[in-house]
Amino acid sequence: MMMKTTAPKTVNTAAKRPQSRGVAETLIPRELIARQVGGRLALDFCNTAGEHLADRPDESLRDWESFLRWATQVGLIGPESYFELLHHTEPVVPIVRLRDAIYRVGLAIADKRRISERDVALLRDHANARRPEIEARNHAVRWKPAPRHASEQLSAVLAGEALSLLCSPQAVRIGICEGGLCGWLFLDESRGKRRRWCDMNDCGSRAKARRYYEKHKEL
């Protein structure tokens, strides 16, 4: 979040409103785990693997810290929870398995293919697990997972988010990026479902450059 700069003025410091970005947030590594282009949290979760259609996708959730950083960046947990949970490392493999199951279901819907009952069962089992407590801090309401059960509880939230989308009429609007092996999913809310790319500044731009090259190569 960008900080406003204002001209110096005399104020009553006791009446100042707290800054929106606390010290804890400024200490979190700033490297972006994945861009938020899916339009829904569950789809952004799916997009934490690059080149998702490749035999070996580019994994962004490499460890517990990278998952916590992503969860903070998308607003799933607050900065304070990031540091609290960082000291209670959990395996990231079950989280990645859940993500991949959500992705396969979303991909099947986008491609109009048969959905795996095994994947749906995995989503259901995670969604039925206990969810975190909720806390209100400053001007936000966030999940507050128990340190020793954070993986299970956050997985329950993500699975619930996924099922809320996949079981809704909006599921038919799930699209897949046409940028080669990208495979990122998004909710196509355009008129006539004409969206083709995860991001026009990324895969869309490369496709445009490729068309330009092919056109002028023939001249």
Please report, for each region that a protein language model flagged, where it lies by residue.
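Short helix-coil boundary/hinge micro-motifs
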Residues: 1-176, 183
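BZIP DNA-binding basic region
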Residues: 153-213, 217-219
